[in-house]
Curated annotation (Swiss-Prot):
It comes from Prochlorococcus marinus (strain NATL1A). It is found in: Cytoplasm. Its main location: cytoplasm. One of its GO terms (biological process) is gluconeogenesis. Pathway: Carbohydrate biosynthesis; gluconeogenesis; Carbohydrate degradation; glycolysis; D-glyceraldehyde 3-phosphate from glycerone phosphate: step 1/1. Homodimer. PROSITE patterns: TIM_1, TIM_2. One of its GO terms (molecular function) is triose-phosphate isomerase activity. It catalyses: D-glyceraldehyde 3-phosphate = dihydroxyacetone phosphate. This is Triosephosphate isomerase. Involved in the gluconeogenesis. Catalyzes stereospecifically the conversion of dihydroxyacetone phosphate (DHAP) to D-glyceraldehyde-3-phosphate (G3P).
Amino acid sequence: MRKPVIAGNWKMNMTCTEAIEYMRVLIPLLKDIPKKDREVVIAPPFTALYPLSEFIRDKNDCLSLSSQNVHWEDSGAYTAEVSPLMLNELSVKCAIVGHSEPRKYFSESDEQINKRAKSAQDHQLIPIVCVGETFQQREMGEAERVIRRQIEQGLEGIEVKKLIVAYEPIWAIGTGKTCEANEANRICGLIRKWIGYEDVIIQYGGSVKSNNIDEIMSMSDIDGVLVGGASLDPTNFARIANYEKI
């Protein structure tokens, strides 16, 4: 049985004060979600992880925190990076790796993403490994080849039972364009086949909103969502977390 994971990636948004106020609104709106039914994860900026880890402690069983990245070394001369040991101290549960923005802006390779994912697992963090194609790659009929390469190289040596994969078609991130639910479901099914483990959690990400979440979560091979901009409003994100299958 695959338990859905609804994750909100705040990216470079929210001060610590804003993050706490956000949680004051969000937590009461999640009170009717049983832990056994689904999990809700928030990935704030690194600066907000400590105050949020203290604030949400013992407040909601289904709510946990994720980092937006993690380095493969425990410490060292890696300016602007965060180590898995630092995240362990904050009771962080997950770590996003391979998001399209670091891939694009910082030229992150599948090899680096693989090292980050392994480091996360070695330190009892669940990596949320992001994969997805550009619009040009999709138009040229290369989407499946690109995603399969990202899966094979990014997940080499990874324990698939302790993993979340997020399919994020890059052309749908922050653009308002959403991959059709049936097509997203088809790709997620292929990812499951390529990984070779039926119970791996596979999320969809890309312009997920409160008005399309019910349809997305009704798909058989989609086990959750990784939400960007729509997660910045607590009421809106609560509606997404409280989805109802069609």
